[in-house]
Structure formats: C-alpha cells, structure tokens
Amino acid sequence: MKKIKVLVNEDKCYLCGGCAGVCPALAIRVSSSWQFFEDKCISCMICIKACPVGALSYEEVAQ
Amino acid sequence: MKYDVVVVGSGVAGPIVARDVAKAGFSVLLVDKKPAIGTPKQCAEGINVNVFKEFDIPYDKRFINREIYGARIYSPSGYTAELRYDKVSGVILERKVFDKMLAYYAAKAGADVWARTEVIDLLRKEGKIMGVKAKHEGELVEIEAKIIVAADGVESTVARLAGINTYAPPHEFDSAYEYEMIIEGYDPDLIHLWFGNEIAPRGYVWVFPKDEDRANVGIGINSDNEKTAKYYLDKWLKENNIPTKKILEINVGLVPVGGFVRELVKENVAVVGDAARQVNPVHGGGMYEAMKAANILAKWIVKALEEENLELLKNYTKEWWEVEGPKMERLLKLRRAMEKLTDEDIDVFVQLLGGTDLEKLAGGNYFEVVKALMKHPKVLMSKRRLEILKALL
Ligand SMILES: Cc1cc2nc3c(=O)[nH]c(=O)nc-3n(C[C@H](O)[C@H](O)[C@H](O)COP(=O)(O)OP(=O)(O)OC[C@H]3O[C@@H](n4cnc5c(N)ncnc54)[C@H](O)[C@@H]3O)c2cc1C
Ligand code: SF4
Ligand code: SF4
C-alpha cells in the first residue's frame, strides 16, 4: 500500500471535526486549525472520502 | 483546579450531565473548545416536542424557531406520503441559542462553565486517570477530577484517549451538508424528506422550515461514498430548479449512524452522546438520544459520588443497553435493510404508505400498518421488500 500525506484545503474546510472522528488512528486533530500527524497516519484514505465538502486530498510520500 | 466531575464538550449531552450532577450538590466543570458555546452548529435542528417535558428544559421561544405539525416524504418518482397532526409534534430549534442556554442552565444549577477550553489529553498520575489537560487561550491548564465525561461529539477523542473503543468503520457514518437558505413553495408547517439512491445514497434530502420562506436544506449520505454530500445537495437543488442565491449559513458534519459502543465506561471515564455513537440510525437525529443517555449517566455519577464507589458508573452502560439498546439495535437493522431498497421499492412503499393510516405508524403503533403492507402483492412478490418490513416487526 502506498504511504500518503493528507492535505487540507483550508478555504474549503469548516473545521467540523468529522475527519478526526472517522480516522481510526487519531491522526487528525481539529481545533482552531486542522492538524495532521503524519507519524500516526495509516494511509487508509477514510477521511478523504468522508469529508462532506471534499476539503481533503493526498500526496504520496516516499516510504 | 479540582472538581468532582469534568465534562468535556458543551453540545447537548454535556450540559445536561453537568446540570443534573451540579443539582445534586457536586462540583462540576463544563468545558468546550468553542469560543461561543453552540456556534458554529452542525445540525438541522429538528426535535420532537416531548423532549422539553421529559428532560426538564424550558419551552423558551428564544431557541424555538418554528413549531412543526408533521412530515411529508417524497419518493424518487414523486409519490408522497404525509402525516399531519392538529397539535404541535416537533420544533425547529436555533441550536446556537439552545446549546448556550443548556450551558446556562448548567451554570445556574451550580456548574462552572469554560468556553474556549480545549481538552488535549488526559491527566495521568501513576497510571491512573486523574483529570484532563486543557488549553485556554494558549495557556495549559490541568484540571483534576474524580470522574471525566467525554461528551465531545463525533470526534470522540477523549474517550479514545482513555481506551474506550468508539471506533466503527466509515460506512457507519453519514456525511452531511446543509444550507440555511431562502426557499419557497414548501408547506412551512411540515418537515420534508426526499428519498432515492440517485438523490441521496443511503440517506435523504431534508427541508426543515425555520420561517415561512427560510429553511435548513440539507443532505446526509453514506460517508464512504466516492462523491461528497455537497455534490449531491447541489445536484438536487439544481435538478429541482431551486434558486441558491440567498444562502444565510452553511453547515457540514458527520453523523454516527451505527456501531454502538459496547462499554460506555472505563475506570472513571464515561462517554455520552455522539461521542458514544448514540444516534438514531434511521433518521440520524442525535439530540434526543444524547439527552436520554446524559440523563442516565448523570444519575449514576451522582450515585457513584454519593456512595464513593466509582464501580457504580458501570451501571450507566448496563442501563443504557437495557433502556435504549434494544430499540437502537432494531433501528440499525431497519437502516441496513433500507439500504438495499431500489428506487422502485421506495416508490412502492411511499405509494402504499400514502394510502394508510400514517398516524398509527408514527404513534409507534405500526404493527398493523406493517402487517397490512406485507399482504400487498407488490410487497409479497419481493423478497427484499418483505425483509424490510419483517425488520420492523
Ligand atoms: C448536518 C447535521 C444535521 C443534523 N440534524 C439533526 C436534527 O435535525 N435533529 C437531531 O436530533 N440531530 C441532528 N443531528 C445530530 C446532532 O447534531 C447530534 O447528534 C448532537 O449534536 C449530539 O450532541 P452531543 O452533545 O453528543 O455532541 P455535540 O453537539 O457535537 O457537542 C460536542 C461538543 O464538544 C466540543 N468538543 C469536542 N472536542 C472537544 C475537546 N477536545 N475539548 C473541548 N470541547 C470539545 C465541541 O466543540 C462541541 O461543542 C445532525 C447532525 C448533522 C451533522
Ligand atoms: S471533515 Fe472536511 S470540513 Fe470537516 S474538519 Fe475535516 S476537512 Fe474540514
Ligand atoms: S488516511 Fe486514514 S489514518 Fe490517515 S488521517 Fe486519514 S483517516 Fe486517518
């Protein structure tokens, strides 16, 4: 499986916290900003599909 | 800082727990990361009118936008079924005011309340959970508490940090997107729901009126869908020629619609509301369930503190599963069966429902209605349709 880094489009994101809720690895924290913890992420892409507005995308990273 | 109880999250569940525990004379701190409790909201704001009595909440016009008398559902080909009472059956709230007032009632009952305070971790000493670590305007604060309540909504980080398993696969969430907008031509005394696999996969489109011509217009779809909720809502509005030039507010959010949490308590931490996935799996409404669970939890917190026996907290899990569990499991089964409906099935059901005594159905006395439907040839000939109805019995 490819290793990814999740990217947020801050102009689209509503900071609703939904992606943090579906993430099985607690790799996202949503407070007054959207934060990603790459070391925790298991590259499952669940958050990307779940975002109601499509604010998330990804880029591949070298393993 | 030391309290008997710290409640994380001041949505619907949190303030009810805080209020009821404070009323019993124990010290409570209620925190929320939002600078203004209730804002922004993630909700269509519809709720049954009975909750005010059941949970001792004032029927205060400051947070009631509109009284509702029933519902109308629409099938993909345009069949409708309507349920209208002569008495008020539900209300469309103003959540921003409602949530803040719930926190106000908690404060009045004796709880301390702190907005703009984000819990970032648990406070552990010698392996035991002693409270929470929080951030308030950039400052780190340690809050000691005998009991920690995770009422932090769909994100559910606090419970997970404590080791409570609130995980469920993405299919057990709905993704939701909503406009508060000017919309005309829909009876403002009813809520309106549209079903169909092309319209809203797994979920529905809703119009919840807040005024004659102003409504929450939103959608929920399965969160593992390739397309976004926004995509489907915009498509529906366009196909129905509904102008989108007067948008007052946009809301987005996720709703847990299944995968209930088995163990709601671990040591001195309890999880409640959306964080515990206590949401009606069929319609995605979570406010009632959040209040109901908060009510049960508060009762056991008070008992545990009175008798200085934290083991008693576990009775919250037991009582929730006894009181709410069976209903929720049944609704989940129904939701899973409904997911298999084709558009043609939906047409048939809505058509048949349109010709039945819907009041009986809504009153919970749906046994007869379902039985009658099961005898209809269009249902009898379809295994899938029969299965759906069987799930209801
Ligand atoms: C678009 C949409 C429409 C909906 N429509 C309806 C409806 O019409 N009727 C209905 O009954 N339900 C509806 N729901 C569901 C309903 O909104 C929730 O079920 C309900 O709000 C759950 O209440 P809660 O108290 O558990 O969580 P929430 O109301 O989500 O409250 C959780 C609170 O915790 C705070 N928080 C989170 N993490 C932290 C932290 N680390 N530190 C401090 N604070 C934190 C958040 O800021 C938030 O205020 C809808 C949901 C969505 C997304
Ligand atoms: S789900 Fe989407 S809108 Fe919500 S916080 Fe995550 S990225 Fe932002
Ligand atoms: S890809 Fe998976 S693990 Fe990584 S942040 Fe998204 S949901 Fe979490």
Curated annotation (Swiss-Prot), chain B:
Residues the record lists as binding a 2,3-bis-O-(geranylgeranyl)-sn-glycerol 1-phospholipid: 327, 363
Any GO molecular function: flavin adenine dinucleotide binding
InterPro entries in UniProt: DGGGPL_reductase, FAD/NAD-bd_sf, Geranylgeranyl_Rdtase_fam, Geranylgeranyl_reductase, GGR_cat
EC number, as in UniProt: 1.3.-.-
UniProt KW Oxidoreductase keyword: yes
Recorded GO CC terms: membrane
Cofactor(s), names only, from the UniProt record: FAD
Keyword list, A-Z: FAD, Flavoprotein, Lipid biosynthesis, Lipid metabolism, Oxidoreductase, Phospholipid biosynthesis, Phospholipid metabolism
Highest taxon of the lineage: Archaea
Family per similarity comment: Belongs to the geranylgeranyl reductase family. DGGGPL reductase subfamily.
Note: Reduction reaction proceeds via syn addition of hydrogen for double bonds.
Protein name, as recorded: Digeranylgeranylglycerophospholipid reductase
Species per Swiss-Prot/TrEMBL record: Pyrococcus furiosus (strain ATCC 43587 / DSM 3638 / JCM 8422 / Vc1)
